[in-house]
């Protein structure tokens, strides 16, 4: 069976190709899965990927535990492939990144209001699945992220029962800190982040 990787990549002047596809399909673009590995987590094996391909990027990169949809964002993984995280549009025997399609076609794909405000497609969805819990971490608001020259990262989660027939090893999520936690306590944990047990879980709802 031919692989998406075997398709010819179109890297520029994609507007006519994309608009013809949108016209032929009634406004739909077919996107190939974007598989993302994480070196610090164990895959949960429930994202519709054959188990033999779980470590397709190599053991040093970690197992694939995420499948991104409609993504124009590259991963922040160390040692990543140049197009890691990017969704590819599949048109006949050709492929091009959704990011390139949006850059060339703008509001035709994302709509006038989003194109005017962001000049890009600023969000994506994903299957996210691990065997055990993920590390304690935070997501900055837009105002917080702006202080360090970044964008905010709001997220929402949905756990469809048809994709979660088993709970794996630790099917729980803890959010926030224990009442009474001070900013100085959190800062001290961050200072000790690479010193073994930094104590952050002592402050969390875990």
Regions found by a protein language model. Name each.
Residues 178-197:
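Short, flexible helix-coil linker/hinge segments at the edges of structured domains or between repeats
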Residues 2-183:
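Transition-metal
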Residues 194-206:
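Loop-centered beta-sheet repeat module
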